[in-house]
Amino acid sequence: MHAVVKWLYLLALIVWVGQVVFFSFVAAPALFRTLSTVEAGRAVGAIFPTYYRLAFACLTILLLGDVLFVVTGTSRAWWTASTCLAAAALAATLYAGIVVQPRATALRPQLHAPEAPPHVRAEFDRLHRLAVQLNGVALVCGLAISAMTAATLKP
């Protein structure tokens, strides 16, 4: 059973970090480079619910795996640190997906209206910056977890 848990842990880590990197550095920039801002925003908005659900699932698996490895494994200090990082990444992702993204989505229809007040653009920009920062925190946590996981692998 321990091999299955390790496999699920590694799969969740790979899928989650891969999706963050792909979306942040490939998909979103390509959409905004090739489509109008309105269409790119609509496309990204359509991706976000699945993006966050997948991240929540992967991070939950990581967190459960980390706790299991702390309790049953060696390298407890590494796994405790990994648990803290996974919890931080999950908190950042939950906040981005449950609080920030819905607020930004609610503002999107007003952004491109001719009579859109300036405070709408300012609030959307603030939410976007916050979402990018939270995503960055999650990515740094994921890269650190990847490095710690690699350090604990047995040849």
Please report, for each region that a protein language model flagged, where it lies by residue.
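Polytopic transmembrane helical bundles with strong interfacial aromatic enrichment
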Residues: 1-155
